[in-house]
Amino acid sequence: MKKREFLKLGLLSVGAMTISNKSGALEYYPNKSDKKWAVLYGTWCGSSRDAAVWISEGMDGIANVFDVREDPDLSGYDHIVVGGSIRAGKVSDLLQEYLKKNRDRLRDKIRGLFVVCGNRMQPPGPEQVTGLIDNHLAILCDVSNELPKKVFLGRITYGLMDEDSRKMLQGFNMPEYDNLKREDCLTFGKEIIYRNMVSK
């Protein structure tokens, strides 16, 4: 292959990847559905990203999955699930800002809420659901507490953390761990679909 042809092919490949990344960055391509579903998440280290994808899988893959950092336009979606990772009792500032800015457009479309947290590696209970979802995420979304909701245990992966957070946790001798369970996320996705069908 001539050098000029090789360079042309290389530039075309890079261009194609750039276009596809801009048009659907971090969008998960699922199965088709007569209704448009989306899962929106905010994450620091990837735990909520994995939870969001697994929740969509539990819904038989009918939901697109969006990272709030992409500032997605969800106006074309009929049903939305919202969740995020917790630090100091709250989801990320970016997710909070997005929900406040889009509250009126999203409120009537939200079908489920979830958070991912460390909870000192202890199983979450009603106290965490009340504190992190009912009294925080549900308020940000301006929705009732009757929606499907779930608190998942998360993980610590130092290689995915910003330097300040990593140093702080390492200062407490916090080990890396992974308590996020795919099966729990799949089950929650199935619950969302079931509850939505029953409520029709």
Place the predicted regions along the sequence by residue.
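FMN-binding flavodoxin-like domain, especially the glycine-rich phosphate-binding loop
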Residues: 25-35, 50, 57-62, 66, ...
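N-terminal beta1-alpha1 ligand-phosphate binding loop
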Residues: 21, 36-54
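Short acidic low-complexity segments
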Residues: 65-75
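A broad, low-specificity signal for short, low-complexity segments enriched in glycine/proline
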Residues: 39-46, 73-75, 108-114
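N-terminal export signals
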Residues: 5-26
